[in-house]
């Protein structure tokens, strides 16, 4: 401790297994660690944390702001048990109007903003983006096809026929007129919605005056589409151009943070977060820690409105400004429209937490009922449900969904592409054996046996208490065989769910090792619960299978040629029209394409000749 500097920095606490227990930052590392070492005046949470700590690591930073930024990054990477943790860390979707093309398209975008174009958002959910794009298609008739599809069109697609696209691909609209539609869409998404609507209304009136009722109807439908977008946005503030609004509510040992996004004076939606935090932490401490993690990988607006003052608010403001590259104001409004926005978010936080508490209570009763029904030693904390999906053995996949005390845990879902070539097409038993073997081999390798998890009852377990299989005695037998070969058959309870003779819901038969098949009463809540779990696994497996099948269907033969990337593929398809035409082309014809050298032309030619 004597060697620790009196500098700002970040420290990490580790337990005997090498797991990170806590990540913290300090203005003075030496003083902070000395405070821990005194061992008096600490809360129960800190006392437990110190008791489990066997070693610490330190990173010295130049400023406390740097320390705060590094702390947020390390918390998200290692997810320590004693820190406040965001449960849902998905990036937010944006609307992208592409650039660098004669006919820009409108798309949903998530992730790094590396593609050229104009980005609008963030939106609270992919559903909100989808609804907005759908309405903007009707209003501005912008294309949503990929560039490769656009370049190879020889006639308008169905979207043109149903008036969702103006078909710039086949010049049904001039580039100049299409650019006008793009400009209107940008203006609407930039907050100039009223001027765009006024322009469309004037055009509709002019068309009506000229007795051009067909065009007047087009303008009318476009106006209706824009009104539809705004009707789904709820409140649109008059005095707030760009802001994120955070409101926190705590009740029953749980926390809800409601976040609203306002951009260009428009409400782009909201999302409720339920961070994992010790019940001893107050709202100011939880909200402050949440803010630092929230903006670790997300752009920060110029204004952040809070329902209450957070700890180290000035330091957080400085850190957000540093990360964003512009001045950020963090405030707790006391009056006016900004105060109303915060109150609206707070109301939503209370309601969302109330619903979550009710769901959690109901879930606990169902888990206890499941334990009693199937003779489990305790209510399961982790349930895994498995299902397979394929068509005559093709594009076969296995799906695993996970549920626990708080419902479905979607970030734990896993998909398995069936790899084995020894499995007969359509052999569901063989597919299930492969899925279970791959899942539990990795589980044993990464986490060992479930015995060590008892030390950390607050963490979501990696080992399942129960696995549910969509199938009967044969499926359960296949699973038990694999688990037995791995020496872990006594660690997991396997239950098979088979539909009745008529495959009607409510007549399911259940299969367990050492028991006769049995059914549950038709109105049993546990039966409904298991049906919901099975249906979710079925939905996930089918969705995964469809995605794989779709990918297989759109795969282009040019993708198999080394050195042919998106740019060269697009150039070849634009010139020849189809991959089949490329396969028939002579080397001299291929060399006429920009980016195709003689060596590449021969590689393409030889690839198709060798088949």
UniProtKB/Swiss-Prot annotation:
InterPro entries: GIY-YIG_endonuc (IPR000305), GIY-YIG_endonuc_sf (IPR035901), GIY-YIG_UvrC_Cho (IPR047296), Hlx-hairpin-Hlx_DNA-bd_motif (IPR003583), RuvA_2-like (IPR010994), UVR_dom (IPR001943), UVR_dom_sf (IPR036876), UvrABC_protein_C (IPR050066). GO terms for biological process: nucleotide-excision repair; SOS response. One of its GO terms (molecular function) is excinuclease ABC activity. It is found in: Cytoplasm. One of its GO terms (cellular component) is cytoplasm. It comes from the Bacteria. Residues 194-229 form the UVR domain. Keywords: Cytoplasm, DNA damage, DNA excision, DNA repair, Excision nuclease, SOS response. SUPFAM superfamilies: C-terminal UvrC-binding domain of UvrB, GIY-YIG endonuclease, RuvA domain 2-like. The keyword Cytoplasm applies. Residues 6-84 form the GIY-YIG domain. Interacts with UvrB in an incision complex. Belongs to the UvrC family. The UvrABC repair system catalyzes the recognition and processing of DNA lesions. UvrC both incises the 5' and 3' sides of the lesion. The N-terminal half is responsible for the 3' incision and the C-terminal half is responsible for the 5' incision. This is UvrABC system protein C. It comes from Brucella suis biovar 1 (strain 1330). The gene is uvrC.
